[in-house]
């Protein structure tokens, strides 16, 4: 389930004038008038909103206790001080825990790659290690091109999922390097650390390039068998079109 990530309309400051609300930089070159406002997690109002948000959606949908929160995805935080980043993430988790004692915080790590100039390890580490590792799960978002676990000391022991993206913004295309994906997965199983938790996909659109997604997920279920890529390809063709005719 999604949870409250602190992004609020700027008009909220009229209702709560004492709340610590910061104006973040505009996203992706948009004019500043469209920039996002951010309710500081250290403000007590953040916990109030989070609790109400989770209570409401749990009544509607139930819960598996896993909550997606991406605070600064493609956004600059109010401060790059490591101490601040650590305090922010710790407070976000504590607000989650007050709303659901079994809460697990799920977040993608695309920000660590997309803003890699700023997300150095001295900032990444406090951001993801300031609360219990077993209460969070990271999605290594774009592993076929950039495995962030390799840049961040295996996420300093925090559980993560190796994810195949393969699709930005719902683009339709038939493309993918199966051999390289297999190589990367084999290496992750061997060297990714005990906190490597599973294989997933972060595709941004459905019904495109089923070949690659079939391979990734079949690899997850039957890891050793799918090392023979030509054999897997022939089997997939048989499943889709029937057996090849000897003639």
Where does each model-flagged region fall?
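Catalytic-core regions of glycoside hydrolase
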Residues: 1-246
